[in-house]
């Protein structure tokens, strides 16, 4: 690709098309300083006021992580019409600024902005990634109000959103309400079923689309492979691969990556490595997604030999420079206890992103290096790097492990008030653990009761563990009751409560719990070692 460069001292008037190319190149490569110089030139020459140029500048600033600067350019646009809003919302959604895109829409809608069909997919994408059901369903209502429900692209986005929420029934209703479904809509629904452990329903839908004369494409087949692979149905995966070939499609990199992903998901790591080798023997070269999918198998078993081989392959092929690959490598080294290797890799990263920062903070947090985690978090804030929900999960984990109760509570509030990030289950689990370790069990329980969502087993598990450490029988019973409802087959929670009764000298309760565990035939989840046997 031809590199576009600018020399500040020798600017001359160029064509509008050339300026557009320069702005796009600076945004793509995140050349913020160079783009600012170009922006200044465009302002002095009067070109910045052109709608097309202003729209490109908005996108440039969002790509560089400068949302406030993007907003300033938008506010100075000569025509703040729907097209400008489409650019602003779309740029935020494409670059991961999901909350900003929703906030911007709320503001514009309050000022009289009518919902435009071009904005809807971006808003639904943001709602999906933020798991903001309330906002997503509000947009769905507006879609019905403005009669956009026959737009196939919008319908596909709605199906994707509801599928991500786990509301497959609502996704199917949206699908069924569309008069004439095309391949894109079918693929969205098939993927929705596959991603929610309903691969058999996905396969039935493929049969339906064939009856309607719509031929499946490679995306259709790969969705089925992914679904059955994650459900650990190897026989069906083989069957789908055969059907795919009979239909004229050869399994591609995505197909093999889906198989590997399912194997890793089900802790069949040796089979995942074998599938990786088979992929190579078929003449297919792994991409960044393949590497990212396979590396967690190395962190689970601490197979550093495999991990280093994959790292070496990434270096040779240039995939190491991919941000998500670099992040996965950091995660692998960190989980295997090789902190120094992770630190070296992080320092060598030329363009650090939110993803790489998050991985390194997690690495420090999980090894008790809270001071370094906080230092890195402060660096992100100081440099204006985007902080997302994972950033706060990582730093709250660090605070919890180090007993930094006040700092953790302040960061939890900062996350909501300054960065407008709605707390997720993982944030609450961190906070319950943080408060529990500090002995603030009542405060932890009050936080659970105030949650806007149903607490999961990690939240209740954190409370039960804290109750055991501090001997709070009353709250322990409450936590154990909820855990028994969420995970009825796991005896571990009952054994934890039994241990608590024993420590308190309540032997009658110990006998009662053991009888209950035996009667219900709870399954005990065995531990495993991360140490590779040689």
Swiss-Prot record:
Family, per entry: Belongs to the PPR family. PCMP-E subfamily.
Source organism superkingdom: Eukaryota
Annotated spans, Type E motif: 459-534
Positions of PPR repeats: 50-80, 81-115, 116-150, 151-181, 182-216, 217-251, 252-286, 287-321, 322-352, 353-387, 388-418, 424-454
Repeat listed as a keyword: yes
Keywords carried by this UniProt record: Repeat
Protein name: Pentatricopeptide repeat-containing protein At5g59600
Gene (UniProt): PCMP-E1
Gene3D superfamilies in UniProt: Tetratricopeptide repeat domain
Record-linked NCBIfam families: PPR
Species for this entry: Arabidopsis thaliana (Mouse-ear cress)
Pfam families xref list: E_motif (PF20431), PPR (PF01535), PPR_2 (PF13041)
A biological process from GO: RNA modification
GO molecular function: RNA binding
